[in-house]
Swiss-Prot record:
Keyword Metal-binding appears in the UniProt entry: yes
Binding site residues for Mn(2+): E122, D124, D131, H137
Superkingdom to which the source organism belongs: Eukaryota
GO cellular component: aleurone grain; vacuole
Gene3D superfamilies reported in the protein's UniProt record: 2.60.120.200
Summary of the tissues where the protein is detected: Seed.
InterPro entries membership: ConA-like_dom_sf, L-lectin, Legume_lectin_dom, Leguminous_Lectin
Organism: Cymbosema roseum (Dioclea purpurea)
Residues that hold Ca(2+) according to the record: D124, Y126, N128, D131
Name assigned to this protein: Lactose-binding lectin-2
Amino acid sequence: SGAVHFSFTKFSTSSSDLTLQGSALVSSKGSLKKNPSKKGKPVDHSVGRALYRSPIHIWDETTGKVASFDATFSFVSEAPAIPMLFPSSKGELNDEDDTRIGGQLGVVNDSYNVIRVTVAVENDGYRNRVDPSARPHISLPIKSVRSKKTAKWNMQTGKVGTAHISYNSVAKRLSAVVSYTGNSSSTTVSYDVLLNLAVLPSKVLVGKTATGLYKDHVETNTILSWSFTSKLKTNSIAD
């Protein structure tokens, strides 16, 4: 079987497993920051991305079998606004495009055309023209910035939260659960989808992105930890 596992309990600029783009940086305390502030003020028109260095094999071209995966982030949102994401994207993400606007999720262009094949879990504190009425919300955009499923999100600024994203390839279900330390309630959203050629290439990049447009609606996003596990079953005896 094809299994992948990685875990960042702290982040380091010397890590060869992590690719930082745009405004993303590692703090002196080992946390990952996207859209960090300058002189105490968040930076608008910015996008920060953190990607695992190697593409993940998400489905097998020969058998058509699809991987199951689990990803967990612990985070602190320091100002209400634009999204945190878990994207699976094809190809390199460069910094010289027009994906910096919040509604673009850091992966589509200014005309809202999908320029990279994307499956995302979005935690969004700001409502724009493609968003549902719920604000803040958690949603599942698939090959589009318009979400397939959405749930109202009880965003708690400055508190440590945990986002757990999973895909069950047997049930064909993509799910996200967000909760906060010391709070028994959580927000859950799920959508049934087969992550095959119709949705994603066989190998994808996994990571996290945060975007910001206006000065009053920029989320300074701190990631404390990130873990990911996937397993793609094949027809080998080892399975």
